[in-house]
From Swiss-Prot:
Keyword terms, alphabetized: Activator, Host nucleus, Host-virus interaction, RNA-binding, Transcription, Transcription regulation
Signal peptide: none
Biased composition (Basic residues): 79-90
Species this protein is from: Simian immunodeficiency virus (isolate Mm142-83)
Biological role stated in the UniProt entry: Transcriptional activator that increases RNA Pol II processivity, thereby increasing the level of full-length viral transcripts. Recognizes a hairpin structure at the 5'-LTR of the nascent viral mRNAs referred to as the transactivation responsive RNA element (TAR) and recruits the cyclin T1-CDK9 complex (P-TEFb complex) that will in turn hyperphosphorylate the RNA polymerase II to allow efficient elongation. The CDK9 component of P-TEFb and other Tat-activated kinases hyperphosphorylate the C-terminus of RNA Pol II that becomes stabilized and much more processive. Extracellular circulating Tat can be endocytosed by surrounding uninfected cells via the binding to several surface receptors. Endosomal low pH allows Tat to cross the endosome membrane to enter the cytosol and eventually further translocate into the nucleus, thereby inducing severe cell dysfunctions ranging from cell activation to cell death. Through.
Keyword RNA-binding: yes
Protein's UniProt name: Protein Tat
Short sequence motif named Nuclear localization signal, and RNA-binding (TAR), residue ranges: 78-84
Amino acid sequence: METPLREQENSLESSNERSSYISEAAAAIPESANLGEEILSQLYRPLEACYNTCYCKKCCYHCQFCFLKKGLGISYEKSHRRRRTPKKAKANTSSASNEPIPNRIRLCQPKKAKKETVEAAVATAPGLGR
């Protein structure tokens, strides 16, 4: 029979062995966590400039920068505003667009008036009585 102190020491040794196994398993987890952190740091790292001008499939997908710029067409560069065309260039358009709008409306209105007069004449004309 062992003394109670030795039993406690043996139980402590066995618990230390278990904790060593746990620490080894826990040691494997941080490596994968480190890998995950490394991947995340790569995602949030500013993209490096790539000066490849080819738009083939291989070149569009070879890095994240090229994928965004060439594959998706996203560019964060300052875009230049387009200049307005001069007023003189606008005056050279077709003659129909130069005609004012009210004149066009007047051309259409007499046709409607003729229809109304025909309808009024039919309404006032005496019919064949009953």
